[in-house]
Amino acid sequence: GSEPLLLGEIWQDGSQFFTGDAFDSVMNYKLSFALGDLFLDKGDAKAADYELTVLRQNYPKEALYDLMNIVDSHDTVRAIYKFGGGSDSVAQPTKKDFDYNLGKARLKLAATFLMGYPGMPTIYYGDEAGQYGSSDPDCRRTYPWGKEDKDLIAYYKKVIGVRNAHKDIFARGDVNTLKAEGDIYAFSRKADSGKMGIVALNRGKAQQVTLPVSAADGTVFTDELTGTKATVSGGQLTLALGENQGMMLVQD
């Protein structure tokens, strides 16, 4: 449009800026804390969901759906580094002094969440390629040209593709928490047409998860990331979630 989007770098609740005379929206550091610190790092889905629910209640829908959703930034520890147990320090690590594979697995979960949640999913440059780093300024390392993690890039492309293919659901649909307990966090998105999508995340060991859903019995959902199908029975959808696995399911 002819008017630029005014986005504020605000770390706290940004409600006071949505009165029409300040910002259109803000960087969503509140989501970064809930998703990154409480859920993916500490395994407390209930606490994470509480923070996100308060956010949804406080913000006008127009601002909520325009939030700059992040999991890390130029001012924070790189997500892959934190999720892999890296230390939050101004000292620059000279080697991968963290569990890269664990960090990568949970970064994939973060990407899945961002692509399924209301707001503008934002990727801090290099996250998709496996760049790591501790506190500012170490988090501002250059892009790892020629050393990119191609598997991670492919995963980012896949979840971005799912969001783009189902914008009516994952970009614009209503959101509702289905389960938030320990290592499991799941929420639904519902388009104006009534078609549903579900994002289910497991940041722990493999387990079977049962979710309450409003869809009719016999309704089939397909995970757009793996092709796995699940059918609603008794108002519930049962999923077999692998270790550190995320799903983006869409109603057939």
Predicted region positions:
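Hydrophobic, well-ordered secondary-structure elements that form the walls
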Residues: 74, 114, 126, 159, ...
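Aromatic-anchored helix/helix-loop segment that forms the rim or "lid"
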Residues: 49, 55, 87-109, 165
